[in-house]
Amino acid sequence: MNRGVRTTVLLCVAFIALVLGALFYSVLREPLLDEVALREQGTFLLPARREIASFSLTDHRGVEFNNTRLAGHWSLLYFGFTACPDVCPVTLSVLAQVEQKLAAEGQPELLNQLQVYFVSVDPERDDAATLGKYLAAFSPRFVGVTGSHETLAAFAAQLNAAFMKVPDANGGYVIDHTGNIVIVDPDGRYAGFIKLPHDADKILMAYKSMARNG
């Protein structure tokens, strides 16, 4: 290899190392938010994380969804229904943006340690096929979950996720439900919630802070 080529190669290697170093430094120096700062951004962590009693639901692929599915990663659960006209699609769009931002930042570990679950509280209309088609419009990583009304009510109660069927003027019904995003830690414990209004950048920073603080 002649001197000119060697110099070019060394300069390219040095440039790549500089870029990677800058990226690594920018990730490391991101400020972690404490509980006070998290609350100011709408994320509320419980003083003591709560164990979740055994439950059994079904995901949109027909696979059982139970406590073991919540272990080993951070989970963000949103309770809603596919016929929801506003807050559900908006919230799922925001959560999809969180995934996209993690991917764009080149942080596959953090992305792989995050799982979004959409828990339908309208089992009469939201079967597996309906859930799967609905969620595909937001992210291929999202998992839809549902079950009997009784099982859903018991599961939601553990996570302070209230919902109620309300008759509408057309003889049908809508579902009144919480707008909070529920946080479950990698040990499968109820860790807190994120209040409305939801913002992708704030949720992203909250997630990074929780993931790095443990």
Regions found by a protein language model. Give the residues of each.
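Conserved helix-turn-beta segment immediately C-terminal to the redox Cys motif
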Residues: L92-V116
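Short, internal strand/loop/helix patches
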Residues: Y117, T130-T178
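Structural alpha/beta surface segment adjacent to cysteine/selenocysteine redox centers
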Residues: S75, A83, N112-P140
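Short active-site neighborhood of thiol/selenol oxidoreductases, capturing the structured segment around
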Residues: F65-L95
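Extracytoplasmic
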Residues: R50-I52, L70-W74, L111-V116, D126, ...
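N-terminal targeting signals for export/organelle localization
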Residues: M1-S54, N213-G214
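Short extracytoplasmic
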Residues: R39-S75
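Thiol-/selenol-based redox modules, centered on thioredoxin-like
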Residues: P167-G214
